[in-house]
Amino acid sequence: MKIIRTVLGDIPASEIGKTDSHDHLIRSGGPEVVRNPMFLMDDTAAAKREFGAFLASGGKTMVCMDPIGCGRNVGKMAEIAEAYRGQGNLVMVTGFHKAENYDPRVSFLATVDEKKIAALMCLEITDGMDLHSYNGPVVERTAYKAGLIKAGTSYRLITYLEQTAL
């Protein structure tokens, strides 16, 4: 059977409905927020209203494309998903953004080999995402699983760090 892996669990692919394939409801921090505070989206009540408006307009599934280390907040996204259980679906991602969002000297993309990065992404899909988005010093794996792998690249270029993630 073909499935869609949502934050709250797998559903038959036939239940996906109208889908917003790239959106952002919560961004609790990260490099983009450091560069431009207007990118901060950390208000769960506002995110619930936004998702509710999407559902009211005929949408069914929203894919939130905030990857590891870029302000992803698994706990808040799970709260939103629970608020709309049975009404709509949220899908979260594992993977990585463009290299400009990671330190080229000390980020795990720069210091960890490809096999370990691939294993980490597989765990996010099979076992659950880290509650803290690997901001350390511990990993606290949740029951909420990623449904897609994001592979962000620079414009007209794939950098060395991006190649590592790919």
Stretch-by-stretch model annotation:
Residues 79-82, 89-166:
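Active-site gating/metal-coordination segments in enzymes
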Residues 1-107:
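N-terminal hydrophobic targeting/anchoring segments and the immediately downstream early-domain regions
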